[in-house]
Amino acid sequence: MVLIQNFKYKLVSLVLGASAVLFPVTATAAEKIEFNFPPFGQFDIEVEDLQNFVETGEISTELAYYLNRLPPDQIAKLPELLSTPLELDPVSIAKFSNSTIGEAVIKNFGKGIKGDVNQNGFYALRGAIIAAAFDPEGLTVMNLLREFPLSTIYVDLEVIDRYIERGKRLFEYRQAIDTAFFPVESNSNKSQRRFNSEIGPQVLGKYSWQKQTFTYNNPNRSKKGYFDLYQPTIERSVPLIVISHGLASDRQTFAYLAEHLTSHGFAVAVIEHDDINLNKFDNFLSGSERFPEPNNLIDQPLDVKYVLDRLETQINPRLQNKINLQQVGVIGQSFGGYTSLALAGGELIADKEATQCQEENREVLLDLSSLAKCTFNELNRDRLQLADPRIKAAIAINPLGKIFGREGISAIEIPTMIISGTNDLIVPPVAEQIKPFVWLDDDLDKYLVLVKPGTHFSFLQEGLGVLPVPDTVVGPSPTSAYPLLKALSTAFFKVHLAQQPEYRAYLQNDSLQQLDNDAFKSTIIFDLTEAQLQEIIDR
């Protein structure tokens, strides 16, 4: 009896809960949702019963068989769950659905949600997603069901269960990290903080600056690229910091940070990477471009090298004398974070036996590291080393770190800071940042900064980008996180480029926590073993 009750509870949770977790469940003429759960048999839910439940709250006898196995609070929330639209632009959804990654994501869901029991539901799902997105009521689960182009939706519970368990595991990891590194703070401790917002590295520095735009030439690209050079009004030679942006970004994404660092006495070069900028990514979403191309992994770090070469040999000598090109730092976000780690010494090592790269085994979802690693394998290169000896320190924000693996990331030999958002759904923190931090050599001057509830978008310039993501994924206003990034990057490069060790005081928790606000909190970690991390996520 207990077995049957557990089965029924799981059955209802999977079928009804999956609609919310796996929103690509489309439907137009769907009349029923059918699923098989051996050895108990075949079951189905009438779409009309669900629709009536959402509109009136009435539960049919057939639907009651499933709903009565759910807790009352979940039953009460279900109508809203099924009818609340996702806050996504329909044009962006349509573009994404026709893109390389979008197709891969929908094909993965199509393994578990089908129009025919023996066939991937990709085409039916994609058509229903796009049609539902343009419905006046928006992209809701019920609209997806109504737009599904076949009468029956076949659900493979084994596949759906696997996806739900993966999402559940990521959520549990996030909770474990929050509990371990962000303990509940007493009101008395909060009141003891005395934060002077007018001092510290988060405050604009004393130097004014000028900005100029230059071109650079990466011979692997079909056209010249651009970078903005910010220089402080200082006559002596100063260190240079290079900023590398991520997907769907450009030179404006971190302009606020470039201005801040320049005001503290650094020269800053902000590069535009043509292969992943706003225009390129918009084309990718339209389906006219592929991403990631195998050469993206090579060309983006090479962009930085060619910018340094341009500054070293072809810029006005008067400018050259004001920039120390042997004391260079790099800071990058997302794919730019990968670039930072690669230039710092991280090596890409091919995995020719990677079964997840085989088409039938790919479960991409939004695992950009695995997707990028699979494209790297297409290059038929055993190893890729892109370190530049001019670079002496690196910051990687929300990087794709897993792509390097333990051996590749351990090749880094310069001071490195990894900044990770605990709520990053695009590049999950445990796999992509925390484990790579653990893999860095213990003798390295290394830092891991966790930002709660930081997301993949928490440090980006507001209002930029073409990614179709809802506000709940973007998180709190990024402007609330700017002071933290300004303080971290200024202090880090003051210590490791400008040789001003007194700034280490700002790279301690006592100082960082003074920057905590209602939106974001942070903590800095210097040492974490694999055993300690495993203990945290196993709790």
Across the structure, where does each feature detected by a protein language model lie?
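Cap/lid segment of the alpha/beta-hydrolase catalytic domain
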Residues: A248, Q252-A255, H260, E272-I298, ...
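Gly/Ala-rich beta-loop-alpha elbow adjacent to hydrolase catalytic centers
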Residues: G246, G332-S340
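Alpha/beta-hydrolase active-site loop
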Residues: R290-L325, A342, K352-D367, L371-A372, ...
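Mature extracellular/secreted ectodomains of secretory-pathway proteins
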Residues: Q42-E46, V54-R194
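Active-site-adjacent alpha-helix of alpha/beta-hydrolase-fold enzymes
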Residues: A411-Y482
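Short beta-strand element of the alpha/beta-hydrolase
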Residues: S237-G246
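Mobile cap/lid helix-loop segments that gate and shape the active-site cleft of serine hydrolases
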Residues: D351-F404, I414, N423-L425, Q433
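N-terminal cap/lid segment of alpha/beta-hydrolase-fold proteins
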Residues: V184-R236
